[in-house]
Amino acid sequence: MDNNDRFRRPSDGRLPHNRKELFFNILRWRFTYLLAIGLLSLAFLLPDIAALTYNDIAASVISQSGEDVASKIVTLRLQTSLLQIICYIVLFFGASGVFYLLRQLAWDEPTSIFSGWWQGVKQNWIHYTFLGVCVGILNVLNTFAEVLLHGFVKYVPRALFVLVVVPVLLYAAILDVVYIKKLGNLLSGAATLYFKTLPITLLFTLLVIAPTLLLFVPKFTIRYAILATWVVVVLPIVLYGWTLYAIDKLDKFINKEHYPEIYNKGVYVDKASSKEDTEE
């Protein structure tokens, strides 16, 4: 099989044989589409970047004042975390459309960016926005813990957030654009899938939150320039890879038995393989 046959143009009407092939097809033929998704994601991340920039500038001014610096910095951190609740609502509202676009790519049925995004928002914004509120509140509680507690213990809530909450949210984001379910069922299903696929899911979680390490870069102009580049170029690839992986697990644990109409959707399965799957 030559390279041009392996990586087929999306317009040639032939489905890829597996999701790995689909992943590289999209990277090759629709990379600009992924960049557009990245720009869309950046647009909804801008309020959070603005809040963090405000925090950086205010902290710099407070540090130079030399008066009651510690208590003022604590107050600033708490104010910023409260402001970020609104930022997370905006971010998750935008994500409701972004994950719909990624689902369409995973099913090899890409739509136009803006109409597809809006379709996803109309279908999923309520659950996503509620999750944004919850994440914002948890962020405030984590900040309180880091301010009030001492030693290693103060980092435990943030660590639990990364190790438990973020992976469950990643699965919930996919479940919500694939199925119509109540939020409680989505979260319980997401938690079950996470613990069934823990190592790989944790790896994707770390890739998604990797940009937070940029907060340790001293110069905030460089920090946010790198962050913007990451969100536009790298994050869409990571999220698309995650979407393909998650949908593959949905096929394995759910779709094969309960939703055969979307089982292996977006990839070519020959009749022999399909027959073997049925007999298993």
Please place each PLM-identified region on the residue numbering.
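Small-residue-enriched core segments of transmembrane alpha-helices in multipass membrane transport
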Residues: 159-163
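Helix-coil boundary and N-terminal low-complexity module in membrane systems
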Residues: 1-143, 147, 151-155, 168-170, ...
